[in-house]
Amino acid sequence: VDALSEHNPRVVSAVKLQRAAQRRKTGQFLAEGANSVAAALETGRVRELFYSMHAATRENPLIAGAAAAGVRTTLVSERAAEHLGETVTAPGLVAVCDHIDVPLADVLAERPTLLAVPVEIAEPGNAGTLIRVADAVGANGVVLAGDAVDPHNGKCVRASAGSLFHVPIARHRDIGEVLDAVAAAGITVLATAAKGEVDLDEADELLAGPVAWLFGNEAHGLDPAVAARADHRVRIPIHGRAESLNLAAAAAICLYASARVQHTK
C-alpha cells in the first residue's frame, strides 16, 4: 500500500480541521494519539483513521480493530503524519471524528446527579482537564456555558485524554437559559466563590442530592450576577497562603467532594 503524502487532498482536508472555522463547517474534528483514538473508536464516531508506518508498528491492534469495524484506515507518510499532528512529536495516529457535543436538553433528560458547568471557560487545556476530571469522578455531563472554548479544539481533545468521548458534553451560549434549565430539572446549583457562605467541608448535606457545580472563567472568576443565581455559594477552605486555586484544581476538589458523598450514601 502506498502511503499518502501531505499533498493528498484527503490529508489536506483533514489538516484543515485544526482550524475552528473548518470544524464548524464540516461538523468534524481530529483526535490524536492512541488514548483519544481508542476512545473515539468505541463511540463509533471515527470517519477515517490516518496512521504512519511508525505508528503501525506500535499500535497495530488498534488500527486492525478499526479496520475490522469498518473504519477507513489510511497509511500516510511520516511527513503527512507530522502535518496531521498538532504536537511537536506527532504520534502518527490521527482520527477524523464527528462532533461529540449534544443539546443541553439531552444531558438533562438523563436525570443527572452530578454536572460540571464551567462558565465562559476560555483555555482549551483547562477545558480538557476539567472534562477528564468530570469523567474520573463519574459526573453525568459537562455543560460549557456562555462564550466557551470549542471542546473539539486539539489542545482540549488531548488534555481530556479520551474522556471527551466518555462524558456527555453540551454547549449553550445563554447562561441564564442554562441556569433555568438545570433548576427546572430539580438540580441544586452550587457556585464556587472565594467568599461563599458555605464551607465545602461542611457541605455534605447539600452534596447528597443532584448537584450542578458552576466554575468561573480562568482570568475573571465567576460573574457575581451568575454566582448570585446559584442556590448556594461554596468556598474551598484554603489553609495556607495561596490566594486561590486554578480552575481545574478547584473543579477537581469540588467534583470529588460531591462524588464522595454520593457514593457513600
Regions found by a protein language model. Give the residues of each.
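N-terminal positively charged helical leader segments and presequences
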Residues: V1-V88
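Active-site/ligand-binding-proximal alpha/beta "capping" segment
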Residues: L190-A242
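Glycine/charged-rich beta-loop-alpha catalytic/anionic-binding loops adjacent to active sites
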Residues: Q18-A21, L108-A116, R229-I238
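Short beta->alpha connector loops at strand-helix junctions that form conserved
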Residues: S52, V76-S77, V119, A145-G146, ...
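Structured adenosyl-cofactor binding patch, chiefly the S-adenosyl-L-methionine
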Residues: A95, V133-V137, P151-N153, R158-L164, ...
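Short, hinge-like loop/turn segments at secondary-structure boundaries
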Residues: A67-A68, G92-L93, A159-S163, L207-P210
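RNA substrate-binding interface of SAM-dependent RNA methyltransferases
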Residues: N35, D101-V102, V107-E197
